[in-house]
């Protein structure tokens, strides 16, 4: 009986048949050819980004504009973004430690005090807010200015905080009292960058603005010690056709020479003790977004929107070489006391370079949108990046 059943033909009724459509037929019905489908698949594969990060933080709901690493407890990272929030989080575990609230607009600046005890946030709502880390990030106070905050800078040896505003004013407070020490006026345009100089000493405060003016202040008195403006055409960051301002700068260890980057691509080198222009460097054609001086070698790196990083000899002021990138370079920083430079690019990639040879040593990927900010741990082993994709990623930059 079993043998008969085996030999019987299998009969399937017509109403039991399901039509099987081949993938190719379906694609044709949808108006997509095999070649187009294959190309779409290849494009998808090409757009997949390898995530090389060792940790990350994903609580922000909008672009991350600023990031800072605690100088004493280097596992602590502070970040601020377009969601009006700041966060304190651990770069080793990715865990949130504290949410910093109270701003009514984007946080565009965030910075730790020199001893790591305070964290300050600056927002487009004209507020500077302050928290104390040693008391569980207890909120201390809020400082009101008259316009959007552009940058923050702590004094490298004391509890003094400076802030630059969109209206051209510069504010300085003493902590922990919160007393306003100085309000400095002299700029007539947004103050794009400012910091205490020289590095690690902070005897003076240098600021640059969107109209092409540099002012070096005495922070104790609030008086300007050096003022250079585009009224002197030799100092003008623009040209006859286009007005321009200063967008970035860095200072030498002695505190007497500044390298200034302009929105037209020009770099000026000035002695602020004598107010003399030492050089005009014009290897780039678009805005210089960041300038970094190497502490291990006489090298100055200038990152530009034109997709290059220009390297100059900071002693002879001669052009050395250009480091090419795929898109605009947003930031550049040297690993501490090394000839190794990290660059953050709008193509979502962090790159590591040896500035002695110009050799590309590594690329670190993981972001899906342009990188807007980065911070390096004090030991130079890791870099934290913030992006338009709302994420913060941690990369091991030793390898």
Swiss-Prot record:
GO terms for biological process: cytosolic large ribosomal subunit assembly. Keywords: Cytoplasm, Nucleus, Repeat, WD repeat. Pfam families: WD40 (PF00400). WD repeats lie at residues 59-99, 102-141, 144-185, 187-227, 241-280, 283-322, 324-363, 366-399. Gene3D superfamilies: YVTN repeat-like/Quinoprotein amine dehydrogenase. It is found in: Cytoplasm; Nucleus. InterPro entries: WD40/YVTN_repeat-like_dom_sf, WD40_repeat_dom_sf, WD40_rpt, WD_repeat_multifunction. GO terms for cellular component: cytosol; nucleus; preribosome, large subunit precursor. This is Uncharacterized WD repeat-containing protein C25H1.08c. It comes from Schizosaccharomyces pombe (strain 972 / ATCC 24843) (Fission yeast). The lineage of its organism: Eukaryota, Fungi, Dikarya, Ascomycota, Taphrinomycotina.
